[in-house]
């Protein structure tokens, strides 16, 4: 792990990292998020009886769109040409929650961790938005990077 913030220059100011001289490599990142809710809310989602339609399909599309728009949301992120974005949603009724996982890939000069994290986060936010009329105290939690591959820092896998 590095002990240097790459987005802070010598004067202490935020700046976008120059990746001009970096090698193009295959890069991949996986992230996850959870949204906890009442069992009745989760049952509405799982049964398809939610009045706004297919919550999982909408959240999946929102996550994919969010990954593509990450550089518009996170100020110092580079715009990336993503080659793959996957968002999966898994109802976990034994825990009254939904687990959201995302995968982002590209061949490029900078990593896709922020895109994967943004995809999982926005998918969770979309579930919240679609279900808030039924339940307002849902909790989004444990947004984290699960794994990344490629680039100078190599492979990372969360424990």
UniProtKB/Swiss-Prot annotation:
Catalyzes the conversion of (8S)-3',8-cyclo-7,8-dihydroguanosine 5'-triphosphate to cyclic pyranopterin monophosphate (cPMP). CDD domains: MoaC_PE. It catalyses: (8S)-3',8-cyclo-7,8-dihydroguanosine 5'-triphosphate = cyclic pyranopterin phosphate + diphosphate. The active site is at 129. InterPro entries: MoaC, MoaC_bact/euk, MoaC_sf, MoCo_biosynth_MoaA/MoaC, Mopterin_CF_biosynth-C_dom. The gene is moaC. Belongs to the MoaC family. Its EC number is 4.6.1.17. Keywords: Lyase, Molybdenum cofactor biosynthesis. Homohexamer; trimer of dimers. Pfam families: MoaC. GO terms for biological process: Mo-molybdopterin cofactor biosynthetic process. It is an enzyme of class 4 (lyase). This is Cyclic pyranopterin monophosphate synthase. Substrate binds at residues 76-78, 114-115. GO terms for molecular function: cyclic pyranopterin monophosphate synthase activity; GTP 3',8'-cyclase activity.
